[in-house]
């Protein structure tokens, strides 16, 4: 019977991938002529509100929200659901703090990547090289882990062997990102956001039904372990320091993540931002609450999972009819794909704009070469990631731990202070980046938890301090000339 079941599961998945390809081809056809870099990496700055909200949410919500998060909720109970809700202001914070100023400056400097912004603001080559390298290293770690997550998911739910799953996954993402660019990435994010929303709601209803209603489900949880329904969670894991760290890492710190930040450069007008903030926050709320609650209540349906991470895929196959499970399986796949495509684009933009064009500025006019390079680099990066995920070395898992927090530690202050503090200069920004990055790497590697805080907290604080001290020694930045080619 498993054969029948898995073919029913795979059909919707294939259909879904086809739709994704269709959208990419559409994005390719819609490309505006001229200003290639601006179009490929930013979709010519033309996003409206709904699309902006969806792309931010879909980029922000990755495999972890569909796999790791609910897994933790399964293990620690309803308290974790509450903890997950701290993430709510993420959209509002990144659009509110960065959004407007960022977009205005980006248009003024004609910036395409985050590093363009940093260069225009601090006028330091060294800074841009450092930023580019840390970005590439971190993204390679983060993307590989997402790939692994995607393949594991297919393995559990549809019984597709790990290697096959990896190939299906990697090839389709690399292709559509390479050919469609930012526009394809954003359109697909919008589609993926919709799929995630519908999927979450359907699954939650299915679980509550299978557990025999909400009251019954909570009673079952209490019978398993009374702490599952207490605010502190099982093993009393949710202490105030833990909560603070979690908030800094996944909510406040998100402002510093390059692939979220770049979404702030690419919208149309203020109306789009205001709409984006409202819609985005609602979508994040529904998704976060839905997925984590599903994980926590899932314990009442399947009490004896050994690997909590598999709670969602297992529930899907158990609670939903095969065809519906297939559609829903597309949701976490969507989450993973939208996160990877954003990071892939960001990496290839970094290589081309910040490393290659910095060395050979005369190539800017050479549209054809840039087009080929962008596509080729995106594909090559995709291939490298596949290799890394094929036999995941221990290093990779460690890299990913570093990736998220490390990026925040490196980028957060130079970005925010660059926008809001007139006197910020290159010396300050460099010292902040080096202190933040190195400190985070050291603390995370040796698992040092100062006063029980996650390494991100001391790293950000000291990085801020380093910025202020370093700033004393630097020269003020000369006001850059207005470089403006587009409107």
Language model feature labels by segment:
Residues 2-487:
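Membrane-embedded helix-loop-helix hairpins and adjacent transmembrane boundary segments
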């Amino acid at each position: 019977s498993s054969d029948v079941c898995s073919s029913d599961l795979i059909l919707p998945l294939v259909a879904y991938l086809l739709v994704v390809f269709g959208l990419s081809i559409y994005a390719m056809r819609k490309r505006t002529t001229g200003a290639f870099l601006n179009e490929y990496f930013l979709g010519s700055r033309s996003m409206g509100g709904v699309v902006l909200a969806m792309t931010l949410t879909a980029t922000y919500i990755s495999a972890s929200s569909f796999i790791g998060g609910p897994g933790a909720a399964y293990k620690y109970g309803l308290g974790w659901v509450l903890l997950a809700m701290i993430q709510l202001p993420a959209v509002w914070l990144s659009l509110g703090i960065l959004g407007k100023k960022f977009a205005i400056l980006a248009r003024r400097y004609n910036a395409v990547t985050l590093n363009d912004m940093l260069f225009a603001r601090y006028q330091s080559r060294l800074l841009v090289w450092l930023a580019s390298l840390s970005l590439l290293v971190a993204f390679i770690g983060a993307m590989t882990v997402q790939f692994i997550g995607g393949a594991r998911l297919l393995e559990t739910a549809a019984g597709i062997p790990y290697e096959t799953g990896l190939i299906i996954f990697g090839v389709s993402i690399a292709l559509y990102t390479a050919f469609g660019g930012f526009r394809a990435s954003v359109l697909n994010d919008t589609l993926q956001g919709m799929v995630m929303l519908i999927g979450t709601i359907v699954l939650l209803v299915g679980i509550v039904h299978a557990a025999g209603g909400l009251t019954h489900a909570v009673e079952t949880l209490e019978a398993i372990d009374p702490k599952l329904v207490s605010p502190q969670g099982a093993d009393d894991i949710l202490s105030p320091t833990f909560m603070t760290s979690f908030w800094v890492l996944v909510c406040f710190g998100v402002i510093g993540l390059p692939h979220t930040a770049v979404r702030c450069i690419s919208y149309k007008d203020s109306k789009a931002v205001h709409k984006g903030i409202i819609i985005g926050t609602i979508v994040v709320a529904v998704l976060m609450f839905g997925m984590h609650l599903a994980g926590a209540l899932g314990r009442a349906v399947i009490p004896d999972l050994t690997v909590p991470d598999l709670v969602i895929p297992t529930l899907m196959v158990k609670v939903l009819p095969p065809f519906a499970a297939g559609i829903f399986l597309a949701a976490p796949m969507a989450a993973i794909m939208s996160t990877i495509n954003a990071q892939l684009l960001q990496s290839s933009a970094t290589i081309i704009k910040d490393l290659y064009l910095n060395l050979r500025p005369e190539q800017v006019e050479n549209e054809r070469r840039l087009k080929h390079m962008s596509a080729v680099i995106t594909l090559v990066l995709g291939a490298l990631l596949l290799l890394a995920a094929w036999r995941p070395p221990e290093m990779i898992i460690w890299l990913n731990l570093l990736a998220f927090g490390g990026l925040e530690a490196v980028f957060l202050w130079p970005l925010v202070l660059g926008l809001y503090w007139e006197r910020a200069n290159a010396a300050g920004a460099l010292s902040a980046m080096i202190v933040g990055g190195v400190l985070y790497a050291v603390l995370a590697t040796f698992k040092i938890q100062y006063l029980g805080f996650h390494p991100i907290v001391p790293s950000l604080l000291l990085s801020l301090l380093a910025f202020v001290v370093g700033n004393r020694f630097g020269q003020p930045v000369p006001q850059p000339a207005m470089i403006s080619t587009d409107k």
